[in-house]
Curated annotation (Swiss-Prot):
Cofactors, names only: Mg(2+)
Alphabetical keyword list: Glycosyltransferase, Magnesium, Pyrimidine biosynthesis, Transferase
Single annotated GO MF: magnesium ion binding
CDD domains: PRTases_typeI (cd06223)
Family, as annotated: Belongs to the purine/pyrimidine phosphoribosyltransferase family. PyrE subfamily.
SUBUNIT field: Homodimer.
Matches recorded under NCBIfam families: pyrE (TIGR00336)
Name of protein: Orotate phosphoribosyltransferase
Organism: Halorhodospira halophila (strain DSM 244 / SL1) (Ectothiorhodospira halophila (strain DSM 244 / SL1))
InterPro entries the UniProt entry points to: OPRT (IPR023031), Or_phspho_trans_dom (IPR004467), PRibTrfase_dom (IPR000836), PRTase-like (IPR029057)
């Protein structure tokens, strides 16, 4: 585990973004942990989050020239990544996002921000559950003449999707592009084991993974 990944887990815990307990997910599964990037809700938090996304993309050697944020949650995430690229890598990368509702006046259309045509986009989101929002974003990008270079997420839960493979793997197969997480469930387990995490919490996560983890 890299230092930035350990820092990210610690920061997520401090902010209450990552919590342990009993949580019912949209899938109906009862999870021993919950991850809510909506609590990265200040300038300092978004700045740190953006830098972590950038670090993961750089280490994965992703070649891209546009950052795309699916509405609504992905919009501040994409903005944070674009700013972090400028601040830490001296790269002035344009960004764009979509509207949930088509605008029929002014500039109109579904997309806001930089032109997508001819660009290699990184789609930025928090996690991948069903993958629907990611696939919709990819369709918008390709319809506008762009391509998807990668998908950047904060956490890969490494859970099964519709089949035995993970929802992340399903997205990779569908888009033909890699999914790059800041951390995975592997990193979280390692962090808890190395930092004296409560034994019952770590056991609960391992039991959950044994039941719902991807093959």
């Amino acid at each position: 585990m890299y230092e930035y990944q350990e820092d990210f887990i610690r920061f997520a815990l401090d902010r209450g973004v990552l919590r342990f307990g009993r949580f019912t997910l949209k899938s109906g599964r009862e999870s021993p942990y919950f991850f809510n990037t909506g609590l990265f809700n200040s300038g300092t938090a978004l700045s740190k989050l953006g830098r972590c996304y950038v670090e993961s993309l750089v280490r994965a050697q992703i070649d891209f020239d546009l950052v795309f944020g699916p509405a609504y949650k992905g919009i501040p995430l994409a903005t944070a990544v674009a700013m972090a690229l400028a601040e830490t890598r001296n790269r002035d990368v344009p960004y764009a996002f979509d509207r949930k509702e088509v605008k029929d006046h002014g500039e109109g259309g579904r997309l806001v921000g930089a032109p997508v045509e001819g660009r290699r986009a990184v789609i930025v989101d928090d996690v991948i559950s069903s993958g629907i929002s990611i696939r919709e974003a990819a369709e918008l990008i390709t319809a506008e003449g762009g391509t998807v270079a990668a998908v950047a997420i904060a956490l890969d839960r490494k859970e099964r999707g519709r089949d035995e493979v993970s929802a992340v793997h399903e997205v990779e197969q569908t888009l033909g592009a890699p999914v790059v997480p800041i951390i995975t469930l592997d990193h979280l387990e390692t962090y808890l084991a190395d930092h004296g995490g409560k034994g019952d919490t770590l056991d609960a996560i391992r039991q959950y993974r044994a039941r719902y983890g991807a093959a």
